[in-house]
Amino acid sequence: SHVSLRHHPDVMNEPYTFAAIYVKGVENGAKVLEGQVPTWKLFGPAQSGLGRGDKTYGLPRFEEAVFQTRFPFATIDLRDKDMPLAAKITGWSPFIPTDADNSSLPVGVLEYQFTNTSDKAIETVFSYNTKNFIDGQGTIRGVKNGFVLESDQNNSGLAIYVDNAAAVVDHCWFRGAWFDPQTVVWDNIRYGRIADKQPVKGVAPGASVYVPLTLQ
């Protein structure tokens, strides 16, 4: 997904940030909440010969994705034969006709809706995960039910939080070399582990927020 901050339309910017869902007791039951990556993205860019560990392209995603837009809303419906649930994402930002100030608030909302398509209750874990792409050598601050990526050098910041009291936050991914942080995070997701780590002093490679859910 393209991410732009501070009014800079960086439409080719794809930082390592994604939402995922895990379903307990289901083979291949962990998926990024996105559709398939177009094959043209996989070849040619810088460092693609090293496997593109800076991208999420290699993580499993939903087989089917249907996109619709009705400004200021956009919706994506996700389905996959491996998953006993359907997912719907609704994205929007404030838009009030004739109210320029409130329509310009630096806020974006992603609403995730899950529907149990099986005949029994299922236990799941939703997560939102991101590398510290604001400042790779910076810290990550905590907020209620979320975290804040920020940088003193360029006066930038990004807060991510969920509206759910059951949220658990991992404020600091595993601090290792190469792609160790990403590997550990994906292992947490695919095994249904919920990491609970408080903010730390010093470098924090990334952060995650987890929400356990039971779907009837």
Each PLM stretch: what is its role?
Residues S1-G44, V66:
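Beta-strand-rich N-terminal accessory domains
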Residues H2, F18, P84-A86, A121-E123, ...:
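Exposed beta-strand and adjacent loop surfaces of beta-rich binding modules
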Residues F43-V107, F174-V211:
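Extended, loop-rich substrate-binding clefts of extracytoplasmic carbohydrate-active enzymes
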